[in-house]
From Swiss-Prot:
Subunit structure comment from the entry: Part of the 30S ribosomal subunit. Forms a loose heterodimer with protein S19. Forms two bridges to the 50S subunit in the 70S ribosome.
Organism: Borreliella burgdorferi (strain ATCC 35210 / DSM 4680 / CIP 102532 / B31)
Region (Disordered) residue spans: 95-125
Keyword rRNA-binding: yes
GO cellular component: cytosol; small ribosomal subunit
GO molecular function, one term: tRNA binding
Its biological purpose: Located at the top of the head of the 30S subunit, it contacts several helices of the 16S rRNA. In the 70S ribosome it contacts the 23S rRNA (bridge B1a) and protein L5 of the 50S subunit (bridge B1b), connecting the 2 subunits; these bridges are implicated in subunit movement. Contacts the tRNAs in the A and P-sites.
Name of the protein: Small ribosomal subunit protein uS13
InterPro entries: Rbsml_uS13_C, Ribosomal_uS13, Ribosomal_uS13-like_H2TH, Ribosomal_uS13_bac-type, Ribosomal_uS13_CS
This protein's UniProt keywords: Ribonucleoprotein, Ribosomal protein, RNA-binding, rRNA-binding, tRNA-binding
Family recorded in the similarity comment: Belongs to the universal ribosomal protein uS13 family.
Pfam families: Ribosomal_S13
Length: 125
């Protein structure tokens, strides 16, 4: 079992798919990594030898930000937006959509479960 960036790659999948289990590597970047390390993307992950795993590891660690470092970088970016109190930061803080979507209806995923207001119909009369 190949272990790259602290993640065990799934054994029975092609390399281009197995690499996507690493946070920060999608399909396109997985193909880039395979090409840079000169390994066939259709090779099964369990068939990799130590030399190939080391080449993959070296390419990923030198050229890309992945896993914990990427997660902390994203969190720091969001925290910076919240600290400077720009529009996006305020929306992050309130837990609302950031990019202009409507919120009168919809936006349930971002807002969470409905919070019912007691006696709303009585109060509106």
């Amino acid at each position: 079992m190949a272990r790259i960036s602290g993640i065990d790659l799934p054994n029975n999948k092609q390399l281009k798919i197995a690499l996507t289990s690493i946070y920060g590597i999608g399909r396109t970047r997985a193909l880039e990594v395979c090409n840079k390390s000169s390994i066939s993307p259709s090779k099964i992950a369990k068939d990799l030898d130590n030399d190939e795993v080391n080449r993959l590891r070296k390419v990923i660690e030198s050229d890309y930000i992945v896993e914990g470092k990427l997660r902390s970088e994203v969190a720091m970016s969001i925290k910076r937006l919240m600290d400077i109190a720009c529009y996006r930061g305020v929306r992050h803080r309130k837990g609302l959509p950031l990019r202009g979507q409507r919120t009168k209806t919809n936006a349930r995923t971002r807002k969470g479960k409905r919070k019912t207001v007691a006696n709303k119909k009585i109060a509106s009369k």
